[in-house]
Amino acid sequence: MATRRLMLLGAPGAGKGTQAQLLMQELGLPQVSTGDILRAAVKEGTPLGLEAQSYMNRGALVPDAVVVGLIEDRLARPDAGGGWILDGFPRTPAQAEALDGLLAHLAQSLEAVVLIDVPEAQLIERLTGRRTCPLCKRIFHVRFNPPPAAPPFCTDHTDCPSELVQRPDDTLEVVSKRLNVYRESTEPLIRYYQEQQKLTSVDGDRSPEVVYSELRELLG
């Protein structure tokens, strides 16, 4: 039987979002993203959403207990009963232990943790090479998906500005910091799931189609 409850790990730029979308399309599983859950709860004005907003408004980290509560609410919904793809949580071993507890409470289990492994030099090239249209937010890449030589850059409007922009998050300085944070927080998490014998990895330094083919083979 195919794996139906899984987690994707990987550094920024590894392609987790792309692979999650492909899995969603083929398997019909919901992607459970902490960012999406937080935004939805705040918008809906749920008790946990309001509590999370109180921290976010101060620029503080939302406590683990609040995030775990939001994830538990999401995993308890009917569309997640047949499986899910967890993205963005946990980020630390403490959060992983909390996840184990809530899954036990829901009588569910995490069946597989897949690490999409990409060399750091390739991650930096992927992230720093992105360029965005400031009007429609379409994303190009100076190497992998170069824009037209001259405007209009986008097919859905003809009033593109003369230059695309690099988002602040995609500068070399910020990308390097994001990768440092990822290494510090995720390496203990990788060991945590290795000890549970749930971790497997795929080489993410290939085309999305090739990575997905190996991912599906691993999941059965």
From Swiss-Prot:
It catalyses: AMP + ATP = 2 ADP. GO terms for biological process: AMP salvage; nucleoside diphosphate metabolic process; nucleoside monophosphate metabolic process. Residues 33-62 are annotated as: NMP. Its EC number is 2.7.4.3. It comes from the Bacteria. Belongs to the adenylate kinase family. Monomer. Consists of three domains, a large central CORE domain and two small peripheral domains, NMPbind and LID, which undergo movements during catalysis. The LID domain closes over the site of phosphoryl transfer upon ATP binding. Assembling and dissambling the active center during each catalytic cycle provides an effective means to prevent ATP hydrolysis. Some bacteria have evolved a zinc-coordinating structure that stabilizes the LID domain. HAMAP family: Adenylate_kinase_Adk (MF_00235). This is Adenylate kinase. It comes from Gloeobacter violaceus (strain ATCC 29082 / PCC 7421). The lineage of its organism: Bacteria, Bacillati, Cyanobacteriota, Cyanophyceae, Gloeobacterales.
